[in-house]
Amino acid sequence: MNGPPAQPPIGLQLSRTARVVTNAFERAMAQAGGSASAWQVLVLVRAGQWGTQAEMAEAMGITGATLTHHLNALEDQGLVRRWREASNRRVQQAALTEAGEELFDRLREVAMRHDQRLRSTLSEKEVEQLGRLLEKVRVGVGS
């Protein structure tokens, strides 16, 4: 019988790392007046490349109800405005307000600094290798 692996299980390492990285990102976003979920919504709304809220929710990996909650909150804060498409009332469009654009710019800086921080301990070759390895794990798990 084989003994225990020399390293902790990969899933545990990935989970711990994801939690640490996510918590650091959330703290940085909160200090700038936002959140990771608000940032994701602002990015997608600003890009304007999503067709329906269902497609947007899928792109974020959340449910439609959760997305609606986020959009409602951003709209209530005056960061996003929504309207029904004239040719198809079932389709809702969204855009950032001026305040939403200002928050987007602030959070983009935070996101870029966070990414630089993550990359700071790795060489360019290691960053590329990490990306390939993470993709390999994702494909191997089936998602």
Question: Where on the chain are the PLM-derived regions?
Answer:
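DNA-binding alpha-helical recognition surfaces that contact promoter or target DNA
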Residues: 43, 69, 132
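C-terminal regulatory/oligomerization modules of transcriptional regulators
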Residues: 1-6, 124-143
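Short alpha-helical "packing" element that flanks the helix-turn-helix/winged-helix DNA-binding module
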Residues: 38-42
